[in-house]
Structure formats: structure tokens, C-alpha cells
């Protein structure tokens, strides 16, 4: 609810394209979250996290806190940035998260919560 209210309150100055890229970046973030949650159930298969912030074997709780914080921070940073800087940031986040998701799927992780 908080995120929804914040988005509705703040993104009036965003272009239609920026809004679409913001949604796309969130889709990639949630897909990364989902595949990484799958990994937490499969450490016994040799999977390890490579994000140094999370450590090699984060708990599901730590992972959830990380991604919720990331999503909230992502909105506020996107809203703070203006014009072309906002667009470059959104393209970059979408590409980086998309690459992480592609890698996770490639190594056998699944999209599931």
C-alpha cells in the first residue's frame, strides 16, 4: 500500500516511457527476487549467491528484507533523478536485473516464491 501510494503521489512528472521502463525494471527486480528465493531452498545442490551484500547463503528473511528495501529505494531514486538521468538509470537497472534473471534461469533456478 505504501509503495502504491508513493507511486501515485510522485510520478506525475515522469514521461510515459519512464513509467513503462520503471514497471519493466520492477518486473526484472521481482523476477530476480523470485529466482533467488528458489536458490535459498536449494543450497544443498551447490547454489551460492554472488551478491556481496547478501553473502553466499542468505536466509529467506534477509533476502526478502533486501529486495523490499531495494524496491522502495529504487522508486525514490528513480523519482529523485530527472530527465535523461532517470532514463539512463532505468535502462541500466532493467538490463542488469534482466541479466541476473537470465543467468539464474540458465543455471536452473526457477521463478517461484
State where each predicted segment sits.
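Hydrophobic alpha-helical membrane segments
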Residues: 7-113
Amino acid at each position: 500500500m505504501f509503495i502504491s501510494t508513493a507511486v501515485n503521489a510522485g510520478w506525475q512528472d515522469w514521461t510515459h516511457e519512464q513509467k513503462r521502463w520503471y514497471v519493466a525494471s520492477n518486473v526484472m527486480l521481482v523476477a530476480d527476487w523470485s529466482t533467488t528465493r528458489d536458490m535459498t531452498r536449494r543450497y544443498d545442490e551447490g547454489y551460492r549467491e554472488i551478491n556481496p551484500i547478501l553473502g553466499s547463503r542468505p536466509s529467506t528473511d534477509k533476502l526478502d528484507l533486501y529486495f523490499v528495501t531495494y524496491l522502495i529505494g529504487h522508486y525514490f531514486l528513480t523519482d529523485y533523478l530527472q530527465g535523461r538521468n532517470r532514463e539512463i538509470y532505468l535502462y541500466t537497472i532493467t538490463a542488469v536485473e534482466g541479466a541476473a534473471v537470465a543467468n539464474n534461469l540458465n543455471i536452473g533456478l526457477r521463478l517461484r516464491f
